[in-house]
């Protein structure tokens, strides 16, 4: 029996599917538009765009795995490279990112590729924080393996979630333009047959350079080609977007959380306050009078 064609969709989205009657779980996503949005917001250089794009892609996969409406995942990557700390936050379809320094410039690697590992650093740690709406979040931390992020996320899944995984992440950039961004996650489920794992290992070179592959064919065609004969079945598709979600109300809460003493100090300086969002660079101004009202509110609470 011939395998069905996967319906073609345009734009950023996550496709979840199974192979070999559920023996293998696969997630593939296109994240071109949100990588471009991140580059524009942060004025990022090509290598920083690639780093942030890869991190958003992998974090969006973790986000789509979350079940609850108010659940979210935050991934902090703290390497010894010049970008400093990079943070991505995702829920079921929305993702945002920021970095200490998104304007780092580095020479290309010897193979002509962007030096993402050099920008992030080869030594450091990656921390995954899952807010499941419980009292305490789930926190998993690993040491960075390469800083290129694909192998680092594979290590995270294997060590922290006891789930052997193949992760491919890619962002193809030309100057200020993101040509293609996306990622693939392949996870053999418990009880997966050895023959199936061998098939995946044989095919893995085909999706090693995923962003370049995605410039040459639709993501759906790539899935059909890569997993032909392995009974791919699409489970669901989730639109993805860069979305911050900051608001004046949230900034008010942030000011109140400083505490009465700190708020009073700001009021005494009588210059008001300006808070900026790290993820979208929106600025929020508060007058001294507005700060007094927040102080009263903090005192009541």
Residue ranges of predicted features:
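Cys/His-clustered metal-coordination modules, chiefly Zn-binding fingers
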Residues: 205-301
